Amino acid sequence: MQMDKDGLVLITGAGGFIGGHLVRDLRECGFQHLRAVDIKPLHEWYQRFDDIENVQADMTLREAAYDATKGARYVFNLAADMGGMGFIENNKASCMLSVLTSTHVLMGAKEQGDCERFFYSSSACVYAAGKQ
């Protein structure tokens, strides 16, 4: 499926390393309507672009996730709590919030009916239990 470059693309976790690079690449490919969302304050984002919509919001909050997904035809859900080796084993409650984040973003995209494609990416910092 070819993505329409005029369709609204939502990138959650956009203030992080991978999310920031995805936003950059989508801009370079000519996508016109990008909504970048991250829980971090804008000045803490890995990279930020002033010619797109940048939003600081907490996707663990249902209303914020629904606001973020409003009108989005394509969703790249990269938002997650992470912290490297040992994080999952030592921060189970935080990991449960990542599940809540994914649930809220997915529900918002589905229930608003505009989303054609939804991409979920696991954290870059997932390790086998024996390496935690």
Model-derived features: where do they sit?
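Conserved glycine-rich Rossmann-like NAD(P)H-binding loop of the short-chain dehydrogenase/reductase
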Residues: F31-P41
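Structural motif
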Residues: L8, R73-Y74, R117
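NAD(P)H-binding glycine-rich loop region in Rossmannoid oxidoreductase-like domains
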Residues: I52, M59-L97, A129
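N-terminal Rossmann NAD(P)H-binding glycine-rich loop of SDR-like oxidoreductase domains
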Residues: G7-C29
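Conserved Rossmann-fold NAD(P)-dependent oxidoreductase catalytic core, especially the SDR/UDP-sugar
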Residues: N77, T103-Q132
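Conserved Rossmann-like nucleotide-binding pocket used by diverse enzymes
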Residues: L10, R35, V55
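A short, basic/flexible loop-to-alpha-helix module at the beginning of a structural domain
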Residues: M1-D6
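Short loop/helix-cap segments at secondary-structure boundaries that form the rim of catalytic
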Residues: H43-D50
